[in-house]
Design a protein with these regions (language model features):
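Basic, glycine/lysine-rich polyanion-binding surfaces/domains
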Residues: 1-199
Length: 199
């Protein structure tokens, strides 16, 4: 089986990361000091590379119909909101645009639910990077990274928005414990470096 590289593979090499194979992807396990990284997660902010997650975009007038076949209830989501099941989450970005995140390797089972897609459907897994920001200071890192007001009373858990972080266009999905950033693979290393600089 062909092993896929994370868009942060250059960062991994530069910082001597210990890597592990995750569902066919070579991903960072730690950067040499797991205890320090765990403490940082509890007290500061950490970035986890989740680029191995499956990413599928749907666009067009029938996107909601196709999204519904993939994730039950997705057609009823309001714009800039989300719906999740056990393996996937659907982001409704506009009236006619969705982005689905799913467990690594689960893309095909989602795509198999559509015998005849009625929307433009693209498997974006290899084309997009994905980070998860965790820890109590992640809000500070995001505040220093964008001009958009991301206060938790304005952007609640379950919300999704599109914004620019350090000149990189991102889709931001907020949960209770994490902020998940989906972006173009091309800009993964520069976004990672910029987030590290502010946090």
């Amino acid at each position: 089986m062909l092993i896929k590289n994370s868009p942060l593979s250059g960062i991994y090499r530069r910082h001597s990361a210990n890597t592990v194979e995750v569902s066919g992807w070579l991903m960072a396990d730690d950067f040499g000091n797991p205890e320090k990284e765990q403490k940082h997660l509890q007290e500061q902010c950490v970035i986890a590379d989740w680029s191995h997650l499956g990413k599928i975009s749907l666009s067009g007038a029938k996107a909601s119909s196709d999204a519904e076949k993939m994730i039950k209830g997705a057609s009823k989501i309001k714009v800039l909101n989300t719906l999740s099941d056990q393996t996937s989450v659907a982001f409704r970005l506009t009236q006619n645009d969705y982005l689905l995140l799913t467990g690594s390797g689960n893309e095909e089972s989602l795509l198999d639910k559509l015998k005849k897609p009625q929307s433009t459907l693209i498997n974006q897994t290899g084309a997009m990077g994905c980070f998860a920001l965790g820890g109590p200071r992640r809000d500070e890192v995001l505040e220093r990274s964008t001009a958009v007001d991301l206060r938790r009373d304005r952007v609640t858990a379950g919300s999704v928005l599109q914004s620019t972080l350090h000149t990189v266009s991102c889709t931001i999905y907020r949960t209770e414990d994490l902020d998940i950033l989906v972006h173009s693979r091309t800009f993964s290393e520069s976004l990672f470096d910029a987030l590290m600089d502010v946090g």
